[in-house]
Amino acid sequence: ATYKVKLVTPSGQPLEFECPDDVYILDQAEEEGIDLPYSCRAGSCSSCAGKVKNGNVDQSDGSFLDDDQIGEGWVLTCVAYPTSDVVIETHKEEELTA
């Protein structure tokens, strides 16, 4: 399946694209020419952190976030597959690690 992903960046400009359910959101964003923050690309740091505002993702490949953080909506875009249409606020590392 393919889902609609909407990224809300700090500029407030929402960026929308379609993402297959077997492609990481970060990877698909790059394919679309969208520049998002990242570092390890393995789900073991917080550089790519965002917050899911609507919809669902599968980020079981990641290890950095604990269950409480995931429950609060935190997401690592480098290891997140969309499992529905999803809205994500990006560039949230400072808020996550504060």
Swiss-Prot record:
NCBIfam families referenced in this protein's UniProt entry, alphabetically: fdx_plant (TIGR02008)
Cofactor binding comment, as recorded: Binds 1 [2Fe-2S] cluster.
Residues annotated for [2Fe-2S] cluster binding in this entry: C40, C45, C48, C78
Superkingdom of origin organism: Eukaryota
Summary of the function given for this chain in its UniProt record: Ferredoxins are iron-sulfur proteins that transfer electrons in a wide variety of metabolic reactions.
Protein name, UniProt field: Ferredoxin-B
GO biological process terms held by the UniProt record: electron transport chain
Lyase in keyword set: no
Annotated localization: Plastid, Chloroplast
Keywords: 2Fe-2S, Chloroplast, Electron transport, Iron, Iron-sulfur, Metal-binding, Plastid, Transport
Organism this protein belongs to: Alocasia macrorrhizos (Giant taro)
Cofactor: [2Fe-2S] cluster
GO cellular component: chloroplast stroma
PROSITE patterns: 2FE2S_FER_1 (PS00197), 2FE2S_FER_2 (PS51085)
CDD domains hit by this protein: fer2
Keyword Signal tagged: no
Family to which the UniProt record says this protein belongs: Belongs to the 2Fe2S plant-type ferredoxin family.
Predominant place of localization: plastid
Molecular function (Gene Ontology), one example: electron transfer activity
InterPro entries attached to this UniProt entry: 2Fe-2S_ferredoxin-like_sf (IPR036010), 2Fe-2S_ferredoxin-type (IPR001041), 2Fe2S_fd_BS (IPR006058), Beta-grasp_dom_sf (IPR012675), Fd_pln (IPR010241)
2Fe-2S ferredoxin-type domain boundaries: 3-94
